[in-house]
Amino acid sequence: MSIKKIEMINFRNHEDTAFDFSPGINIIWGENGSGKTSIIEAVHILSNGKSFKTNRLIETITSNKKEAIVKAVFGDKNMVFHQTKKPSKKIKINNIEKSTKDLVGKNPTVLVSPEEEKITKGPHSERRRFFDRVFSNISKTYFNNLINYSTALKNRNTLLKQQKDKHEIEIWNNPLIKYGCQLWEERKLLHSKFNKNIEGVCGGYNKKVDIAVSLDCPSDTGQNRFKNRLNEKLEKELFLGRTLSGPHLDKYTTNFNNKDLRVYGSQGEHKLTFLIFKIAEHGFIKNETGKKPTLLLDDLFSKLDLERGNAIFDLIKSSGQTFITNTDLITAEQHGIDINNPNNKTIHLVRSWKN
């Protein structure tokens, strides 16, 4: 489902701007600080209920203003994002308020931006977060198990920090075990499928590249074994104030040509792996759900050589609606994008003297 138009009021540096979009490729270009990224950030918030720039949506409100409003037409639906300084966030679809949970998987997006590069360069927690988000987009069951497990984990950790009675702590063991084991079961299945998508992308690359993601989790993920691990580690957990067993500790390791990318990878290998991850993510969501995710490319072409840029262009050709931000049109053309195609649209932004 493509976004037809958007209006932003006091959102970042957009005081009152509106744009119509093409269902194909939309190139948003202009100098830095002109508000290019803010447009795809707004699309991301409406699709996911979250920003990729900040965890505090109050920061999206224009300086010295009381609220930010984004209105958009997604297919046949009217959507509104309203953020006040209380702080309070509301997202409505056809005047019916929706939670972030309601939005997950409805209008999936694939974001390719500098903020996402930590997927390969960052700690295991970044890759867990990435895969949890991707898997939640294609499986409501996975998402619900993740939410329920996270709630049980948070409550159990609170009791551990407070040095509560063991019987109180054990109250949260049952939901932790139930949802944790269900999470493990589906995580292993989806992880295997995602690796096959990576393998397919690597097979189409003109250089010999072998990339795979290993998942380090217990070999026995049954409920009895999980319960035993919790009992065995309880004394240490009380001392440290946190739960020491469960899916929240799983480790994803990226191997590039049989070596740990995070430890031994070059900058070029990180960039290539990141792009392959994103191409695989797009194909994975499309294959599993039948939906073509909206592609959000933020300031990408200026950082890519021609070969890697062409790999992204191949992704664009297989995508639905695409948004690209760039400082000029020349590099987009160099990577094969026809700016004169009537199915594509260019939007030129000029930096305001107020910014």
Residue positions per predicted region:
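Conserved NTPase motor "head" modules and their coupling/switch loops across ABC/AAA+ ATPases, GTPases
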Residues: 1-31, 167-178, 182-294, 303, ...
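Structural recognition of the conserved hydrophobic beta-strand(s) that form the central parallel beta-sheet
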Residues: 72, 321-328
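Conserved lysine of the Walker
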Residues: 36
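Helix-to-loop junction immediately C-terminal to a conserved catalytic motif
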Residues: 44
